[in-house]
């Protein structure tokens, strides 16, 4: 915790990110909710006071195209129109972007640029193996585009994952240029 000039601990507000528009239907029904099924709740969610809503990225892009026959960019723009007071966040698979294989730096940079231009404020960037090399390009591109680069460290258990490991990872992520750090516990 940070201390001010009088040596008192400064309290910072807790900021809450709601992930239901991405993670809930990704986890429960294979990302099959259409944009039109989600839009009716957007105005109410916008009034709650969330810091951000994670509504894009992960499997949503692929499912929109392949199974729902929707334009994922149009979905993002509709969310941006509906969330007037809430930041929009996406889940970004590092060098894999939103896909299932690594892409070149130029593709990562372009995708980040287009995501921010179409309404994303915060890009939550992760690599499932915590290989920080796979995060660097997306962090740098997010910062270049004036987006918020949030690095999510993938939490796991095991003898190698000591408190020193997590502290070291956080320091390296900070040095990389991340605007914030998140612990992503995918196993729950």
Explain the meaning of each model-derived region.
Residues 22-26, 31:
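Acidic, glycine/proline-rich low-complexity segments that act as flexible tails and inter-domain linkers
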Residues 11-16, 30-60, 65-87, 96-188:
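Alpha/beta enzyme core
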Residues 1-12:
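Basic/polar N-terminal segments that are highly enriched at the extreme N-terminus
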């Amino acid at each position: 915790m940070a201390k001010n000039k009088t040596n008192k601990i400064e309290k910072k507000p807790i900021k809450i990110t709601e992930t239901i528009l991405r993670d809930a239907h990704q986890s429960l029904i294979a990302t099959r909710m259409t944009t039109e099924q989600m839009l009716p709740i957007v105005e109410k969610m916008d009034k709650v006071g969330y810091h951000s809503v994670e509504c894009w990225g992960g499997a949503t892009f692929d499912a929109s195209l392949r199974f729902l026959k929707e334009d994922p960019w149009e979905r993002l723009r509709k969310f941006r129109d509906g969330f007037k007071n809430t930041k929009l966040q996406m889940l970004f698979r590092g060098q894999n972007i939103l896909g299932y294989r690594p892409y070149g730096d130029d593709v990562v940079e372009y995708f980040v640029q287009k995501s921010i231009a179409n309404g994303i404020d915060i890009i939550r960037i992760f690599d499932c193996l915590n290989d920080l090399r796979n995060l660097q390009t997306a962090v740098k591109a997010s910062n270049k585009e004036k987006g918020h680069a949030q690095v999510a460290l993938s939490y796991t258990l095991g003898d190698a994952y000591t408190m020193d490991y997590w502290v070291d990872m956080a320091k390296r992520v900070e040095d990389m240029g991340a605007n914030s750090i998140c612990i992503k516990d995918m196993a729950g």
